[in-house]
Amino acid sequence: MAEDDTYLGAHEQMFHLDPLTHTIFNPELFQPEMPLPTADGPYLQILEQPKQRGFRFRYVCEGPSHGGLPGASSEKNKKSYPQVKICNYVGPAKVIVQLVTNGKNIHLHAHSLVGKHCEDGICTVTAGPKDMVVGFANLGILHVTKKKVFETLEARMTEACTKGYNPGLLVHPDLAYLQAEGGGDRQLTDREKEIIRQAALQQTKEMDLSVVRLMFTAFLPDSTGSFTRRLEPVVSDAIYDSKAPNASNLKIVRMDRTAGCVTGGEEIYLLCDKVQKDDIQIRFYEEEENGGIWEGFGDFSPTDVHRQFAIVFKTPKYKDVNITKPASVFVQLRRKSDLETSEPKPFLYYPEIKDKEEVQRKRQKLMPNFSDSFGGGSGAGAGGGGMFGSGGGGGGAGSTGPGYGFPHYGFPTYGGITFHPGTTKSNAGMKHGTIDTPSKNDSEGCGKNVDREAVNLSGKVTEPTEQDKESSMGVDEVTLTYTVGIKEENSRFQDNLFLEKAMQLAKRHANALFDYAVTGDVKMLLAVQRHLTAVQDENGDSVLHLAIIHLHAQLVRDLLEVTSGLISDDIINMRNDLYQTPLHLAVITKQEAVVDDLLRAGADLSLLDRLGNSVLHLAAKEGQDKILSILLKHKKAALLMDHPNGEGLNAIHIAVMSNSMPCLLLLVAAGADVNAQERKSGRTALHLAVEHDNISLAGCLLLEGDAHVDSTTYDGTTPLHIAAGRGSTRLAALLKAAGADPLVENFEPLYDLDDSWEKDGEDEGVVPGTTPLDMATNWQVFDILNGKPYEPEFTSDDLLAQGDMKQLTEDAKLQLYKLLEIPDPDKNWATLAQKLGLGILNNAFRLSPAPSKTLMDNYEVSGGTIKELVEALRQMGYTEAIEVIQAAFCAPETAAPSPGKGAPQTLSLPLSSASTRSPVDEVRDDSICDSGVETSFRKLSFTESLTSGSSLLTLNKAPHEYGQEGPIEGKI
């Protein structure tokens, strides 16, 4: 046979096989499709593999499956099934099929094969004597319940040993000597039974019930006709249970967004086919022109996977955040265990919009040129002559009336100037007040006067033709002449009225100019134009908006003063096209003085921008603690403290997301609800701090804000669930020390509801939820949740060696203590403690008779360095204290001449210049370590107790303050 020759030709290239070893059946080294021949003898080959996915394992109570296990090439109209062939042999034979595991080492599986020719979980089929191809058309897989895995596996192993069905490979290597016997089943010794029991016990713990493989073994007859000659077995591809999360085909069904900013961090809701929450990734990738691949992964935790069908994640940062045009990439699901991926979907990264509030764009707008105010010749037919020149051109786009030139801002105007109608009754939302349409009263009064175009039109109408003169009656001529006379008179009246008003306006402005020349006070000029402050430009900005955008604080103050009592309430709260009030812009542009001026002038604190943000939200987002402090003093601030924006976030949530410790402390002190839930998923500020892995803010919320440590989201998730799912040992330790319960169940089922079949008819109640212990991703977190003390990565000796505070002399320390005891709040020990990250201990320091000394002692034993101390003093502007430290290092060298030269030599203290510090460094100093908790974990500060010398971080609160009963004191 030609096809047999192919296999025979391969024999010379194959090594001679010893008895089966685990290495041969390592799935990474062994390909099931390849025949495993013996030297010049018969061997078994798989002709068609079973279909890997789409076949469901069924429980006993579900009944038999509909149709057998299909083959890999099976189609809807062309069914196929697994097939094997005994090569190089013709005659009677027996083929058995067993279910084995998919691990690195092959073992018997607890599931059973059912169907035709199947008994006790094993399928036995005879082959030959002519056709050596064997098909398995009716195979089904019976899913064993979790409770019966050990019992079933032990029985299956016992049968394999008694019948000699590969016991050395599938049960234990020590049982390899057991072979098939012609006389029937053999009896097992007690030692063999114990080996089987221990093997079953061990393999039960490691068995994956969602995947199996078929192992085919052929037996040929011996001289007595008994089937004892075993050929080397072959193993199929893995077969995955279709209802198992890690077996289904990955598929993205829907995303609520398909584009995002290059900076990442944008939240996307993704619907998908069944996934396993701890075995799934969201991969973004781009194939580069040079053949390389960029990839990034969405940020989410197991708590963000809802019922295996939805994932809420944040986009990763793109490789280049400075792109100028959109970049197209792909997004796909990827399973961690086998790296299988879904079909990729397109995703677009667009350039960062750095000026979302459009402040920079408006600042870059061309400034008006002073020379544009001179020469009315640019108007529609206007001549020259200067501002009050006699150029006789008519009023056009560049002039007012017969010759007054004013800069044009694009308003609907008389000659470029806009008069706001009814300024004493103006609407704060009104834009572009115009008077280019005559009112109803004007059109009906004064003898039914009409405009100049009407006069010109009527003038044309009243010129009769010769034919009209001949045919017209005398009465018509009189009437027509009378009408024309009336209209001409009205036209002259309107012209005179307009000129009179224009002259009055000019006199007012001239008098204001004289007053300004005498006093030098610009308010003299602004006072006569205060009614125009309600006019808005093409962006909806008033003069007050523009003055704030261009950082003219004094002009803002002048405008507020001249409009006081007239239309101030309308103008000061007027919104532009972005729904920004002047107060919003003052916060965005970080102008503390302007914010204060606007509030004093009556600005409304409660107005929201287009995204629903109040000024409290904006100040917290920008990390402007000084502005936030001003705002919180307002009487309406209390009503806005817990008001959500369009994203459902309160100001305290935004302060946490912006990593602003000063803003968080201000909000907590002002009475903000630290347990308030954001509107999307019910997360509190503590949840957000844990999500951002910010131990400093989490500690502040617990210690300063008395946050409820076991607060839950809409799906019952606590902060400890998030910390455990993300594998954060430090946050898990902090929350556990604060009394968090590791046994709280959320609403996510611990196992798939479809697994209710496993109960085999037994009612075991509802499916339990998932606890933090269930979600622990590493052993460190698991041990902490079980009460094991937190162990840092470094020992105390290593960390203490980093400090050099001992180099300071006692005299220098005494001088520092004295300087830090002054009452100045900007230069005392309390401010220094905040800068050094020990601010959380200030209340304890105050109990000490010498707070400054206690602070410095704590800083020294926590491994503090002189460099950090000097930098903190530099931020405070405390030059006297810095000079004390410098003198302490210079004095010894000045007294002792350098050997060999005899000249004094000064030590250069490694002080970092404030000018070289980046804003990021300042944020880190002021925010990350400000609560003291971060310092405790980072330095393992073995602080001597202020009263008894106990450990440095002890969370001592009443049980009810953490929402727990019983003792909750924890030490880290």
Curated annotation (Swiss-Prot):
Modification sites for N6-acetyllysine: K431, K440
Modified residues ((3S)-3-hydroxyasparagine): N675
ANK repeat start and end residues: 539-568, 578-607, 611-640, 647-676, 681-711, 715-744, 768-798
Post-translational modification (record): Generation of the NF-kappa-B p50 (Nuclear factor NF-kappa-B p50 subunit) transcription factor takes place both cotranslationally and post-translationally via non-mutually exclusive mechanisms. A cotranslational processing allows the production of both p50 and p105 (Nuclear factor NF-kappa-B p105 subunit) from a single NFKB1 mRNA. While translation occurs, the particular unfolded structure after the GRR repeat region acts as a substrate for the proteasome, promoting degradation of the C-terminus. S-nitrosylation of Cys-61 affects DNA binding.
GO CC entries: cytoplasm; nucleus
Start-end of Basic and acidic residues biased regions: 439-454
Pfam families reported for this sequence: Ank, Ank_2, Death, RHD_dimer, RHD_DNA_bind
Residues covered by region (GRR): 372-394
Residue ranges of the region described as Disordered: 425-473, 894-926
Domain of life: Eukaryota
Listed name of the protein: Nuclear factor NF-kappa-B p105 subunit
